[in-house]
């Protein structure tokens, strides 16, 4: 257990990418740029041990995957989709009327978007729902999913989620090579305008490498959660909230903050007991051993200071009055209030996207939303009257900046 002062002194959660990957990723990207589909098939064989004749799956395969779902799985995916869709429709930015002002903004959906869906050890239909639904609501014209190939075939639930969300193209390719393909295009894969979705360090570094040639959502690090709890919290539930993050990755970070030392000690005992038989024990044990923190705060203000310093991907408040933290906890990817709003609900069915900022980037950026799949530009349409009211000031500023043709462009209209 750490005091708030000890924690704040030691805390530095800004993970840097492994610089040794730069050369590997740059070589992969260059190879895909030059060799196209051939490079993708070679990398599928090299990295995933899968020989791929066709990179693109047929739309009929997506529909078949959906049709073959059992009722419980279909209902779960559909409910998740509907909740995400309704939430995103509610927060979608509304077009301003050109009748109300001479200066306003217009929004347009991005033309083509690529979504990375992780594969390998686990499959994530929820990632499809939490990204492609947003693109669909935004009105993106062409939604492309890339996901690593499997010898047994792509996870059927992932394909079904692609069908539900109206994905236009699904390609069997993963890793840095898929990011390169989406950026540069190949014989089969069209280049996109923006790439979103989580992945491993190779994917993260590839997104960083191609940024500027294509838009990206973020460069994601390991998952993280910070919880503020008091004596009213259900400590068994809190332990599983901690395990739920820790089971993702040995590097996953979990923080529990309380003003009550006894509560933290009790929680620690429960966590250690449950660790003996918890599923995915190997991953969870490593995460708990290296990236789990119990932090004792002196008061609510100090607890919030710690939370805002961590700026976690997920923040959970499980106290008697969680609502009192709404305005005090500012820098988090998503804020979960109360016993019945565990972070895991946000992973699957709450409505907001689970693609959230990590590594303290919540201090300056936001979780993925429908509006990230749209562009905006300002429109300026002045009347002669308004022009005459502002022209002299504009002309004068141009003059003091010695931009004389700017000045003349205004002057000739007066």
Swiss-Prot record:
BP term (GO), one: L-histidine biosynthetic process
Enzyme class, broadest EC rank: oxidoreductase
Active-site residues from the entry: 313 (proton acceptor), 314 (proton acceptor)
The record's free-text note on cofactor binding: Binds 1 zinc ion per subunit.
UniProt protein name: Histidinol dehydrogenase
Gene3D superfamilies: 1.20.5.1300, Nitrogenase molybdenum iron protein domain (3.40.50.1980)
Signal peptide segment: none
Pathway: Amino-acid biosynthesis; L-histidine biosynthesis; L-histidine from 5-phospho-alpha-D-ribose 1-diphosphate: step 9/9
Source organism of the structure: Staphylococcus epidermidis (strain ATCC 35984 / DSM 28319 / BCRC 17069 / CCUG 31568 / BM 3577 / RP62A)
Pfam families to which the protein is assigned, alphabetical: Histidinol_dh (PF00815)
Residues binding substrate, per UniProt: 223, 245, 248, 314, 347, 401, 406
InterPro entries: Ald_DH/histidinol_DH, Histidinol_DH_CS, Histidinol_DH_monofunct, Hstdl_DH
Keyword annotations from UniProtKB, A to Z: Amino-acid biosynthesis, Histidine biosynthesis, Metal-binding, NAD, Oxidoreductase, Zinc
GO cellular component term of the entry, any: cytosol
Enzyme Commission code(s) on record: 1.1.1.23
